């Protein structure tokens, strides 16, 4: 097993070296990079599902599905099945989740309870992964699809290398491929403040949040592109992390416009994972999760510089909401 892993790593580095050489030639001729990105959306049916009525959840999902179809953007949604179980609303919530597969989008597992591998331990986490499969597998099978992808809650992949390797082996044994993240603009934090503003009818704050979110996302893409080039010499097929919330439901098309202005085409997660960067050695372990560009940089002993500073005023508003009774 270890020999095969070593051979794969050497092969990946050789092919990456070829990609770097080609990319260098493109840079010298002034050619634009072939930018592609896969969209992944976490915390289905909704990040704030417990505080959201079935009617609001259904409306949000309908808007997001319509925007994805209109923009012709493929996506994979990662499910926390615990959020389906609210007294008197289970059927409606499952129906809202089924809209994803009925619209032709794939679902992945995000654990049942959004458990962090770093916090609950391996056995409890494994049980939560299994518990999070039941409804999702049924919905996918009804549309001749398989449950193929797993996304780590909080991007926590293990506090130590042994735990990480055991968790990885467990996921492979259940037929999963881990969905990495290379671009993350913290839409979950924007989304929480946005939903609060929407409930209170504060249209001015909603608009301010949207503009800040779109601007910050643009900065994060620029940072990820540059870090990629510093790390491997070219811009790989990126994977963007989003969350199921009303911010995305209401403004996804505007986000798409920002991304397209940077020259991106939207691709499937499967196509993105075909980029050889996702075969690079990755021994990242820590108390806190992070994106995979950081994984690879730290694995190579080159911790990255800090990314764009997240707007402090959004953080302060999010804290104030959490303190509100």
Where are these regions (language model features)?
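Bacterial N-terminal signal peptides that target proteins for export
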Residues: 2-14
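C-terminal domain-boundary segment and adjacent tail
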Residues: 32, 72-75, 180, 234, ...
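Acidic/histidine-rich helix-loop elements
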Residues: 44-58, 121-124, 195-200, 206, ...
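Short, basic, helix/turn surface patches
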Residues: 101-109, 135-140, 203-222, 290-310, ...
């Amino acid at each position: 097993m270890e020999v095969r892993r070593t051979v794969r790593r050497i092969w990946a580095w050789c092919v990456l070296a070829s990609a770097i050489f080609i990319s260098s030639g493109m840079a010298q001729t002034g050619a634009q990079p072939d930018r592609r990105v896969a969209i992944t959306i976490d915390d289905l049916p909704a990040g704030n599902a417990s505080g959201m009525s079935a009617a609001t959840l259904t409306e949000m999902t309908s808007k997001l599905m319509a925007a994805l179809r209109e923009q012709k953007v493929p996506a994979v949604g990662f499910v926390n099945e615990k959020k389906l179980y609210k007294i008197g609303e289970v059927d409606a919530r499952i129906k809202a989740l089924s809209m994803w597969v009925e619209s032709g989008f794939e679902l992945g597992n995000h654990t049942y309870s959004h458990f962090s591998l770093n916090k609950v331990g391996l056995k409890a986490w494994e049980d939560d992964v299994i518990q999070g499969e039941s409804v999702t597998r049924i919905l996918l099978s009804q549309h001749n699809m398989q449950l193929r992808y797993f996304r780590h809650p909080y991007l926590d992949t293990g506090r130590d290398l042994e735990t990480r390797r055991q968790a990885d082996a467990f996921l492979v044994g259940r037929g999963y491929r881990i969905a990495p993240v290379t671009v993350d603009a913290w839409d979950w934090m924007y989304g929480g403040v946005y939903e609060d503003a929407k409930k209170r009818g504060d249209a001015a704050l909603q608009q301010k949040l949207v503009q800040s979110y779109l601007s910050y996302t643009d900065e994060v893409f620029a940072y990820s592109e540059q870090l990629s080039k510093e790390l491997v010499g070219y811009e790989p097929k990126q994977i963007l992390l989003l969350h199921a919330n009303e911010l995305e439901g209401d403004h996804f098309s505007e986000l798409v416009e920002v991304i397209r202005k940077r020259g991106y085409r939207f691709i499937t997660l499967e196509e993105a994972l075909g980029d050889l960067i996702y075969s690079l050695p990755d021994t990242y372990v820590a108390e806190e999760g992070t994106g995979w560009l950081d994984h690879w940089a730290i694995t190579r002993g080159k911790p990255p510089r800090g990314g764009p500073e997240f707007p402090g005023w959004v953080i302060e508003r999010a804290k104030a909401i959490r303190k509100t009774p």
